[in-house]
Amino acid sequence: MRILSITAQKPHSTGSGVYLTETVRGFKELGHTQAVIAGVTREDSVKLPEGVGFYPVYYNSPELPFPVCGMSDEMPYESTRYRYMKPDMVDKFEAAFGSAVLRVVKEFRPDVVICHHLYLLAAIVREKLQDMAVWGICHGTDLRQMYTNPTRAREDTPGDSRAKQDMLPACSAKDGDSELLRRRAG
C-alpha cells in the first residue's frame, strides 16, 4: 500500500511527531511505500526511515512567514499559536499546505492519506481530496484547539463540516472528550 502521512508540525519534536515517525517506521517494516508532508523550518534535520519520501512545507519562509504552528500552547520550539493566526496567515497556511498536498498526491499517488491532528490541516486535506481515503489521527490537543478556538475552527477551516463528519468519529475519546465530540460533530 502507498501511504501519505501529513502533519503541520515537525515530525520529531513532540509526542504527535514521534507518533507519526514511529507509525511510518512500523508501516515500513510491513513493506508499505510511504511519503510524509510536514511543516518544518529550513534549519530542521528530519530523519525518517530510508526510502520514505519527504516533502517539507517550510515555515519562516516567504510562503509561510511565521513559526511552525503548534497544537499545544507550549511547544519545545518557537511556534505560532493557532488562536493568534490572523486571516492572512490562515490563507497562507491553506495555500502552502493545499498546494503541497495536491502536488504530492499527483506525484506519489497514495492509496490512503493519514492526517495527524483533526484541526485546520485535516480539514484542508479533506476538502482538497474529497474522492480519496483520508484517515485522521486524533492526538487530543486538536480537540483542545477546537474547544478553545471554536470561531476559528468554524469560520476559517475550509470544509470544516465535512471534516468533522468524516474524521471526528475516528477519534479515540477519553476523559470527557466524547461530550466535546458530540457537540462538535453535531
Language model segments and positions:
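Active-site proximal beta-strand in glycosyltransferases
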Residues: 112-115, 125-145, 167
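N-terminal subdomain of nucleotide-sugar transferases
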Residues: 1-58
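Membrane-proximal helix-turn-helix segments that form the acceptor-binding/catalytic region
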Residues: 149-168
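Alpha-helix capping/helix-boundary segments
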Residues: 42, 120-121, 172-174
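A conserved catalytic-core segment of Leloir-type glycosyltransferases
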Residues: 38-100
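Short N-terminal targeting/anchoring amphipathic segment
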Residues: 90-92, 101-120
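A short, active-site helix/loop in glycosyltransferases that binds the activated sugar's phosphate group
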Residues: 164-186
